UniProtKB/Swiss-Prot annotation:
Compartments where found: Cytoplasm
Residue ranges of the motif 'KMSKS' region: 265-269
Placement of sequence motif 'HIGH' region: 21-31
Reaction catalysis annotation: tRNA(Glu) + L-glutamate + ATP = L-glutamyl-tRNA(Glu) + AMP + diphosphate
Name of the protein in question: Glutamate--tRNA ligase
UniProt GO molecular function: ATP binding; glutamate-tRNA ligase activity; tRNA binding; zinc ion binding
Length: 506
């Protein structure tokens, strides 16, 4: 395979793209990026996105995985125009329901001489390669191309059943990749390949191009790992066009690998690859989609944060970079934080509630089912917490102390380390000053003024040493919402109980 001059073709007028995952595991970020880029291209061009399922692997496919794929697309807001649950003129849209179609196409390819019966076993292919002085892994050698009827009959008499192979032409195969420019595969570099197993099961090498052809897909956007299969599909497309099954050759674009830590390809087994891990940690759809879009594409050289509406206005797959993209979880979290800050406060709270309920902080998993007090506290806390969290999973740690009516909160280990020798004396002075404040005056500004006077101006403590013990008493955490606002939300009785509780435990 060689890259020639950088030639990227024009897109067709009526773009038809597809997303066609196999239901063989939990949705991963590479799969979702593929869906995102296809969706963005369809929306940017006013084209059509087809969603179908490639479920012909009876051993690995599962209905659970199928449902997870649907769940992930719906959560992310990636919609489609034709296919699963939507219907359309080219159904069915699950390969397991299209077996008769594949058998019919395979029979036509065989009858036309584009495919042939192959009786060779893997062991025989390996032995022939070794005998000819070729590496054992050289691949299929074309042995069965010209078998006579007598030879075929003899194999059948032995009980052998043939696979079907496509005849690859003895010529260079080149195409203009939408992302990589012109790519050329030299003659002889791609052997004749199997499209139907001896047991009659059609393979991906047949089903995928046949579905694309019959669904009139004209732009194929997929991962770099499938680049090596493109010359096979180009040849098969030529044959399908000759047979009147395909209308045209689609354009191909191969998106770059997503790399993980240590510059290795991100594996499906890596936690960072698991889409639902990111959702469980508190990524919001806007933040995660924004970051996935950056794995190969950018809206502008000096801009990383954008909405999906902005993406679909600007996206062109020909702008995707061919170089591998590295999944940087820190950058992903940073971008997610930006999108959290852009949410309306009520939207932020409603999205946070399932995480709060999961972590045992509130009584229900949806906003409308919360108690009046929970809604009141969260509404007051939103402007304090929303600018400070990066993931919705962090909200519980920030608001738990505000929702709790406990008098003493056991400090976390990192919070305890912040307490200096002066903590006891600081708490004594703080308690004395705050006990003199009327509940009617228990307001943020007055609390700040009272403690600042007692601890900094009169006590002589630096602000960090003055307010640190009070913060630990109020939240039990090293990082918490703003102190005086928190004290106002919690109220005088609970605030004093917490200060006294920590003082007693020192």
């Amino acid at each position: 395979m060689t890259d020639a001059e950088n030639t990227k073709p024009e897109l067709p007028k009526n773009v038809r793209v597809r997303f066609c995952p196999s239901p063989t595991g939990t949705p991963h970020v590479g799969m979702i990026r593929t869906a995102l880029f296809n969706w963005a291209e369809a929306r940017a061009t006013g084209g059509t996105l087809i969603f179908r399922i490639e479920d012909t692997d009876a051993v690995r496919d599962s209905e659970e995985s199928y449902n997870q794929i649907l769940e992930s697309l719906r959560w992310l807001g990636i919609d489609w125009d034709e296919g699963i649950d939507v219907g359309g003129p080219h159904g069915p849209y699950r390969q397991s329901e299209r077996t008769a179609i594949y058998k019919d196409v395979a029979a036509k390819l065989l009858e036309a001489g584009y495919a042939y019966e192959s009786f060779s076993t893997p062991e025989e292919i390996k032995e022939r390669n070794l005998a000819a002085g070729r590496p054992a892994e050289f691949g299929y050698d074309g042995y069965d191309r010209n078998l006579t009827d007598e030879q075929k009959a003899a194999f059948r008499a032995e009980g052998r059943k043939p696979a079907l192979r496509i005849k690859m032409p003895d010529e260079d195969i080149a195409f203009d990749d939408l992302i990589r420019g012109t790519i050329e595969f030299k003659a002889g570099s791609v052997p004749d390949y199997v499209i139907v197993r001896p047991n009659g099961d059609p393979l991906y090498t047949l089903t995928n191009p046949v579905d694309d052809a019959m669904m009139e897909v004209n732009v194929v956007l997929r991962g770099e790992d499938l680049l090596s299969s493109t010359p096979r599909q180009i040849v098969l497309y030529r044959y399908l066009m000759e047979l009147g099954i395909a209308k045209e050759m689609p354009l191909f674009g191969h998106m770059p690998y997503v790399m993980g830590q240590g510059n290795k390809k991100l594996s499906k087994r890596d936690p960072e690859s698991n889409l639902f891990n990111h959702r469980d940690n508190g990524f919001i759809r806007e933040g995660l989609l924004n970051y996935l879009a950056l794995l190969g594409w950018s809206i502008a050289p000096d801009r990383d944060v954008f909405s999906m509406d902005e993406m679909t206005e600007k996206f062109d797959v020909r702008d995707v970079k061919a170089n591998p993209a590295r999944f940087d979880i820190d950058k992903a979290i940073s971008i997610n934080a930006e999108h959290i800050r852009m949410l309306e406060p009520e939207d932020f709270l409603r999205r946070s509630v399932p995480y709060l309920h999961r972590d045992g902080v509130v009584s229900a998993d949806n906003w409308d089912a919360l108690t009046d007090r929970e809604r009141e506290v969260l509404t007051a806390a939103a402007p304090l917490v929303q600018p400070r969290v990066r993931l919705l999973g962090e909200v519980a740690g920030m608001v738990g102390s505000l929702l709790s009516t406990e008098g003493y909160l056991e400090p976390a280990d990192d919070a305890k380390k912040q307490l200096k020798d002066s903590a006891g004396e600081v708490l004594d002075k703080a308690i004395a000053a705050l006990e003199a404040v009327d509940e009617a005056d228990w307001k943020t500004d007055n609390l700040h003024e009272t403690l600042n006077k007692a601890l900094v101006e009169e006590g002589g403590y630096k602000p960090r040493l003055a307010f640190g013990p009070v913060r630990v008493a109020m939240s039990g955490r090293r990082v918490s919402p703003p102190l005086f606002e928190s004290m106002e939300i919690v109220g005088k009785p609970v605030s004093l109980a917490r200060l006294k509780g920590l003082r007693e435990h020192l």
